[in-house]
Amino acid sequence: MLNNIKINQTTNEIILNVNVIAEIHEILEELQIDEVDGILLAGSRPLGWSENIYSKIAEIALNHKKIFFADYWGKDLLNTINNAIHSIIKINEEEFINTFCCDLTSENISFSDDELKNKIVNKSQELKNIIIVTRGCKSTFSAANGVFYETPVKKVNAVNVIACGDSFSAGFLYEYIKSKDINASLQTGTDCAAKNAESLCPGSIV
């Protein structure tokens, strides 16, 4: 899923049919990359997509000086980092550990909260970017260029968990583009995820 976000206008979500894969430049032309402020690329790479397509999209976005938000993990994330450092990475705790802290085939690796905080801070400092690690019903751990943030989740009457992560990502990126305020962006993302959890319609925060 690709979202292109422009402040004061709508957010367009483009779901690409894996049976009709466009060339990378055609995808970004469809996104009107010169007209947007940021690009959010979320979800696992579908079968049929080339292994380097995510990294190429990131590279082109960053070459156009756009904020690039990565909401995926594993080999695709590592391949992208080798080619172009993301502005923002958002993954859950298990994905962070499996991507950055151990072999991707390892299982049942866990860390204390303090250990996890240190790893997020160090990785953010190394990559000189923002890393957000969601932890389900526990507070969200984040770091921006080595500065740590912790954001409590909102307690709601959840009726749906589908698309909560996507809602968080979209809310965070929208606020970050608008204000560049990390705390405000984390709060907006948290609010959007909570509203989605309260809705029977996944992806809806109205």
What are these language model-derived features?
Residues 33, 81-83, 125:
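A short, aliphatic-rich alpha-helical micro-motif
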Residues 14-17, 45-49, 76, 98, ...:
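Short, small-residue-enriched loops and turns at beta-alpha junctions
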Residues 24-27, 53, 57, 119:
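A general structural detector for well-ordered alpha-helical segments in enzyme core domains, enriched
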Residues 38-111:
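Conserved beta-alpha-beta core of the PfkB/ribokinase-like small-molecule kinase fold
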Residues 1-37:
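Conserved N-terminal subdomain of the carbohydrate kinase-like
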Residues 8-11, 40-42, 71, 134:
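Short beta-strand segments
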Residues 59, 106-206:
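Conserved phosphate-binding/catalytic region of the ribokinase-like
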